[in-house]
């Protein structure tokens, strides 16, 4: 067992512990592998981690992320409900995210989002999230003469979390690229749960779209 601590937000350290058990058979595939149990407050996640010099994998993670842990990640007023993680797996190498799958469930509740000196309230519906790795086109790389010798456009992948209602109605999308930039799109269906919101449009239409560094989320 080992203890860990990170500063997820200024002056708000998050601490916990991790238990691991080596799985030496992963060495046959050129990777170190271990089963892990990660705890922080009431958060408890179990899965398998594999890695080498150029890639890492987090496989078959299950458990829950508790409200007290979420409160250390973001400076928002949060619902008193854990996020349940089911069969979540992610693989990443130098080219980006290669594969991702799994789901999450959140019962929702009252959320307060501070911005511009004000706190905006929204009553989050019950949400489901599905994880995938989606391709994103990257501009071809030119050589010293300004000529691209390849006829193929380079491809990268982003980690995609699609948020829906339990009835599979779209609420929003989060895309995280290999440079830790996050793209957020939120729909009319989600935003109309905010009392101060007066926007109009089709429920599936995107009404908020932002791109920012992952490290600035929740500050």
Question: Regions from the language model: what does each represent?
Answer:
Residues 9-14, 39-48, 63-72, 110-115, ...:
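Short, surface-exposed beta-strand/loop "edge" segments at domain boundaries and coil↔beta transitions
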Residues 75-113:
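Hydrophobic, aromatic-enriched interface-forming segments
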Residues 14, 79, 123-125, 155-157, ...:
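Residues that define the transmembrane beta-barrel architecture of outer-membrane proteins
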Residues 2-88:
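N-terminal beta-strand/beta-hairpin edge segment
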Residues 16-27, 45-50, 90, 129-131, ...:
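Broad, structure-driven detector of short, well-ordered beta-strand segments within folded domains
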Residues 2-4, 32-36, 55-63, 102-105, ...:
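Short, hydrophobic/proline-enriched secondary-structure or compact coil segments at domain edges
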Residues 97-141:
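Short helix-loop boundary/capping segments
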Residues 138-219:
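Extracytoplasmic/luminal low-complexity segments enriched in Pro/Gly and acidic/polar residues
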């Amino acid at each position: 067992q080992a203890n860990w601590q990170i500063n997820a937000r200024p002056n708000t350290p998050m601490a916990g512990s991790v238990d691991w058990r080596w799985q030496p058979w992963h060495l046959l595939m050129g990777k170190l592998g271990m089963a892990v149990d990660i705890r922080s407050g009431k958060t408890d996640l179990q899965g398998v981690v594999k890695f080498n010099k150029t890639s890492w994998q987090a496989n078959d993670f299950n458990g829950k992320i508790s409200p007290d842990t979420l409160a250390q990640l973001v400076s928002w007023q949060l619902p008193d409900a854990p996020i349940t993680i089911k069969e979540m797996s992610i693989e990443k190498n130098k080219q980006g995210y290669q594969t991702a799958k799994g789901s999450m469930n959140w019962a929702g509740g009252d959320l307060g989002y501070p911005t511009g000196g004000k706190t905006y309230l929204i009553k989050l519906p019950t949400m489901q999230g599905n994880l995938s790795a989606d391709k994103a086109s990257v501009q071809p790389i030119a050589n010293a003469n300004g000529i691209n010798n390849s006829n193929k456009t380079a491809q990268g992948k982003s980690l995609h979390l699609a948020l829906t209602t339990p009835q599979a109605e779209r609420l929003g999308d989060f895309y995280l690229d290999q440079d830790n930039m996050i793209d957020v799109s939120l729909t009319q269906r989600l935003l109309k749960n905010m009392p101060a919101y007066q926007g109009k449009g089709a429920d599936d239409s995107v009404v908020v779209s932002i791109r920012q560094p992952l490290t600035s989320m929740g500050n």
